[in-house]
């Protein structure tokens, strides 16, 4: 049996970020993952500005190596397509200037991102990184946990569980399954040769009437590729008996804004499916000697489906909470509340806004009315851009009266 201060379960973005942050303060850890890397990971492959921001905060040198090795495509905004074919281009940073602004976002295959992060951990952790290692069960002891794995037992004073929402091992702490209304089902595939991609690599979100409250997406990737997919809330899929692959193909073949762009495109491989635990968890994500991070904490953005940035942030925050625990020699339930409070402070407002907008998407007539009012409204693009950079504007967007006044040009 090997002993360590922190056992990190899961070597995705949340787990590897936690490991790298712990290493900066020389906190011993072991990180385990059931997979070998590089691995395929079903994802939209779009990384918001949170990703370069938090990696740069950890280490500017790591961000430089990421750009050099993975060669991600820089993405500068989002193109929203609303019912009625209203199109809104929203830059991540208004009046972007490369000389003074940081990179606003990326698109890159998750396979490359995850492999890069694991390599960074491997360089500092050596044999403490255990891949192809399955967690069988976890038992709570007086001074921590015993983690039983396919490669032997690990004794740890703390656990950071970044194993996702569908892990099968038995744990001595609550880890609720996502409810249907708090889960999105998604299908994605890759195409080569899609025409009409935005010159500044805006990702495209199509909020089409027949798939609300979900959306169809087109995300440009390096080497002339595009990630194409569709995501809809699970309860809606079950109620309407929606075949996501069939609906995606129907949009590609027949939607007037989409189909001409795919006329000469080639699909690469079969569609793949995944589920996303949508954010704003109402359960405890930390307790005595444990924390949940990333998808295990249900931190996927309810509107956009983005999870990588939130996973990286939660891994970083979990590691800093663990550092505080060892500095203060406190691992009790009350002390661990600080982790959940910090997650809510950093990510909570944004997820509340996304939740409210996602709920609104259930009403196509309302969405159409808003899109019609917003069309040509000079305040809308700037207001939406400010959501990505200005916390005060995010708070205002929680107020429906403020939104109504903007739509009415008041």
Predicted regions and their residues:
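Glycine-rich FAD pyrophosphate-binding loop
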Residues: 7, 23-43
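Short beta-strand to alpha-helix junction loop
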Residues: 96-119, 238-243
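FAD/FMN-dependent oxidoreductases across multiple families
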Residues: 137, 153, 236-321, 327
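C-terminal helical "tail/cap" subdomain of flavin- and related membrane-associated enzymes
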Residues: 323-410
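Beta1/beta-strand and adjacent pyrophosphate-binding region of the FAD-binding site
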Residues: 1-14
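Residue-level detector of alpha-helix initiation sites
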Residues: 12-13, 37-38, 112
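N-terminal FAD cofactor-binding segment of flavoenzymes
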Residues: 41-84
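Predominantly flavin-linked oxidoreductase catalytic cores and closely associated redox partners
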Residues: 120-261
